Amino acid sequence: MSEQLVTPENVTTKDGKINLLDLNRQQMREFFKDLGEKPFRADQVMKWMYHYCCDNFDEMTDINKVLRGKLKEVAEIRAPEVVEEQRSSDGTIKWAIAVGDQRVETVYIPEDDRATLCVSSQVGCALECKFCSTAQQGFNRNLRVSEIIGQVWRAAKIVGAAKVTGQRPITNVVMMGMGEPLLNLNNVVPAMEIMLDDFGFGLSKRRVTLSTSGVVPALDKLGDMIDVALAISLHAPNDEIRDEIVPINKKYNIETFLAAVRRYLEKSNANQGRVTIEYVMLDHVNDGTEHAHQLAELLKDTPCKINLIPWNPFPGAPYGRSSNSRIDRFSKVLMSYGFTTIVRKTRGDDIDAACGQLAGDVIDRTKRTLRKRMQGEAIDIKAV
């Protein structure tokens, strides 16, 4: 992958200071160079920021006092704050996180062998997928780098402080929260770079996953920027159904989307040659055995594993959750074709933290112009 510098939209705070959470390592080194310091100082500060979740320059004991004073004058480390916490009976935690005067939601999902953090990339979403609660709230804006990586930072700080209670440290990050990550590449990519950086959170590229509904030009662009695990929100075995439930399919149909996925796989080491297919199970919409046969035929040339996701309801939604028996029959058809097929266990649905339930603030649904502009950015690659 090419080492392409991605410039954040805006890295200064209201008081004119640089928020260091907005900078990846290359940018951090440039920042310290401008201060007249050696590049290794950037590495030292990043280690304090991400290995120890430190946001106080005075606590960085291997930084000399003069430099600490200089940093306090021109920079800060400001992660978004948690304004509400909900805990599920299954151990899942959902945090409402303040980003300016709005909120996004971040979900911590502990399991026996890992702990996954589901991170948001936008306030709301422009894509209007019919089965997703986030999409029904409309689109407001992109999150900055500091607001994306800040979700990981804040969660890591909370979990780190709670080690005595047995909470597992974050081992995986999935860009599957609110928003379409590929419509915010300029901020999502630097945030993921920090997740992967040894002086950042040091995660393996196989443990950072980006999920997309199919913004094809941006997916091609992503392949030249960074290598992470890829999950695609397919949800339908044919264009007729997908046009209805995932409207971006009218711009980039399934064939076009899967071709872009295969191009990404050719460049990627993180995916080990196959992609994760996400398929939400909607009762008598896309969950029949005939749909399973169609899906198997559709994916025969795309190396993949398939996650079947029981749909999680929200008020006013026109769908129902597929029965366990229908999901089981669907899964067995796919496995008969040789596909690795997993029925995802629903986590956090009692606190509306499950897949498709994140909403954050309710946003004025009349903001159609903003949503159409964002959909236009999916077409104009210069705007993505």
Curated annotation (Swiss-Prot):
Annotated cofactor note: Binds 1 [4Fe-4S] cluster. The cluster is coordinated with 3 cysteines and an exchangeable S-adenosyl-L-methionine.
Principal cellular location given in the protein's record: cytoplasm
Keyword GTP-binding: no
PROSITE patterns: RADICAL_SAM (PS51918)
Localization per record: Cytoplasm
Residues that coordinate or bind [4Fe-4S] cluster: 125, 129, 132
Effect of residue 118 to A: No change in iron-sulfur cluster content. No effect on methylation of Cys-355
Disruption phenotype: Cells lacking this gene lack nucleoside m2A in both rRNA and tRNAs. Inactivation of rlmN produces an error-prone phenotype since it increases the misreading of a UAG stop codon, and thus decreases translational accuracy. Also leads to increased susceptibility to tiamulin, hygromycin A and sparsomycin.
Record domain Radical SAM core: where: 111-350
InterPro entries: Aldolase_TIM (IPR013785), Methyltransferase_A (IPR040072), RlmN_N (IPR048641), RNA_MTrfase_RlmN (IPR027492), rRNA_lsu_MTrfase_RlmN/Cfr (IPR004383), rSAM (IPR007197)
Enzyme class: transferase
Residues holding S-adenosyl-L-methionine: 179-180, 211, 233-235, 312
Cofactor dependence: [4Fe-4S] cluster
Alphabetized UniProt keyword annotations: 4Fe-4S, Antibiotic resistance, Cytoplasm, Disulfide bond, Iron, Iron-sulfur, Metal-binding, Methyltransferase, rRNA processing, S-adenosyl-L-methionine, Transferase, tRNA processing
Enzyme Commission number, as recorded: 2.1.1.192
Signal peptide (from-to): none
Disulfide bonds: 118-355
Note: Reaction proceeds by a ping-pong mechanism involving intermediate methylation of a conserved cysteine residue. In details, the methyl group from one SAM molecule is initially transferred to Cys-355 in a typical SN2 displacement. Then a 5'-dA radical formed from a second molecule of SAM abstracts a hydrogen from the methyl group of mCys-355, and the resulting Cys-appended methyl radical attacks the substrate adenine ring.
Name of the protein in question: Dual-specificity RNA methyltransferase RlmN
Originating species: Escherichia coli (strain K12)
Gene name linked to the record: rlmN
